[in-house]
Amino acid sequence: RVDLAVQACTRLNKRLVVIGGGGEMDKLRAMAGPTIEFKGGGLSDEEVRSYYLRAKGFLFPGEEDFGITPVEAQSAGTPVLAYGRGGACESVLPGKTGYWFKEQTVESLADCIERFERDGVACSKEEIREHSRSFSEERFERELKEYCLRRMADWQQELLDCSHWEKEELD
């Protein structure tokens, strides 16, 4: 819902850099005011990271099961203003690493931007970066491995318990 970000920032006269492309770009450009800049797709990872590092905040108005871009922004120490549904509810800590807005409307996002401008966030850039590390690939692999080992141990114990019962029944 990039359209919400474009409309909210146009209404508030706030600078917004839109990175990426797609079939909606002509429509987005038509609704954009003079404070909206479109970079298109094809930027290198380093260029995108540079924008994350310089951004005051990152707007994530869509709803996704997880959504990697809020975590990427936080890995640069950038607070995230996200629609409070889906994966953003796990990756964004309201008032600390960013804010949630309640409805997917221009008004709700604009209110969230104004609250962020007024109140800021409690976490420093380094604390936001540290929070993003809790979503690392290494952590995921470690926790998945630990889970599998626990389940295997439980399963092994169940097999041992079952073999005991079967032996008694055979005797």
Named regions from a protein language model:
Residues 1-11, 23-26:
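A conserved mid-protein helix/loop that constitutes part of the nucleotide-sugar donor-binding site
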Residues 26-46, 50:
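Nucleotide-activated donor-binding/catalytic signature segment of Leloir-type glycosyltransferases, i.e.
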Residues 49, 71-75, 89-90, 96:
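Short alpha-helical segment that forms part of, or immediately flanks, the ligand-binding pocket
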Residues 50-55, 144:
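Short alpha-helical donor nucleotide-sugar binding micro-motif in glycosyltransferases
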Residues 53-65, 78:
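Acidic donor-binding loop of glycosyltransferase active sites
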Residues 79-83, 92:
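Short hydrophobic beta-strand element within catalytic cores of glycosyltransferases
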Residues 104, 122-170:
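A charged, aromatic-enriched C-terminal amphipathic alpha-helix characteristic of glycosyltransferases
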